[in-house]
Amino acid sequence: MAKYNEKELADTSKFLSFVLRHKPEAIGIVLDREGWADIDKLILCAQKAGKRLTRALLDTVVATSDKKRFSHSSDGRCIRAVQGHSTSQVAISFAEKTPPQFLYHGTASRFLDEIKKQGLIAGERHYVHLSADEATARKVGARHGSPVILTVKAQEMAKRGIPFWQAENGVWLTSTVAVEFLEW
């Protein structure tokens, strides 16, 4: 595996997140319903758009991402973002799964007033993202400011018929979390 510096890996990861989660049309690629993009076409379109992207760099980002944001298809010809999509091109069919008793959501303190009014909503994404542990939720919340960890009564939600899914990178997903299922 070729050597890349941390900035190059982080910049490429952000670029891939933008294109594979939110705006594939920004470089002229089309994702299938499961979010897959042909790697050769992705690299070519990225280069035409002025982004330095090679197969080796892409593979390094996939292999070294601590959050496992991306995955290769079984034949190695395609790549996708595992979760976090806002583009209408993608509707990944996750298998429904029974959650643990509690899940966690990391946010910034400045969002608490709104969350107390409406609960957790997906916003522009397809799902609300939840963590299985407080440490991961804290890291997520810290990206947005002073972190606050909310506890989600996940099993109680599931018992009331609210579905949960788990992405292959371990992130838990649900459509919304009503205020009654949150602990501050």
Curated annotation (Swiss-Prot):
tRNA processing recorded as keyword: no
InterPro entries per record: Ptrans_KptA/Tpt1, RNA_2'-PTrans_C, RNA_2'-PTrans_KptA, RNA_2'-PTrans_N
Coiled-coil boundaries: none
Key words, A-Z: NAD, Transferase
A Pfam match: PTS_2-RNA
Keyword Transferase: yes
EC number of this enzyme: 2.7.1.-
One GO-annotated biological process of the protein: tRNA splicing, via endonucleolytic cleavage and ligation
Top EC class of this enzyme: transferase
Molecular function as annotated in GO: NAD+ poly-ADP-ribosyltransferase activity; tRNA 2'-phosphotransferase activity
Entry similarity comment: Belongs to the KptA/TPT1 family.
Role of this protein: Removes the 2'-phosphate from RNA via an intermediate in which the phosphate is ADP-ribosylated by NAD followed by a presumed transesterification to release the RNA and generate ADP-ribose 1''-2''-cyclic phosphate (APPR>P). May function as an ADP-ribosylase.
Designated name of the protein: Probable RNA 2'-phosphotransferase
Source organism (scientific name): Escherichia coli O8 (strain IAI1)
Organism placement in taxonomy: Bacteria, Pseudomonadati, Pseudomonadota, Gammaproteobacteria, Enterobacterales
Name of the gene this protein is made from: kptA
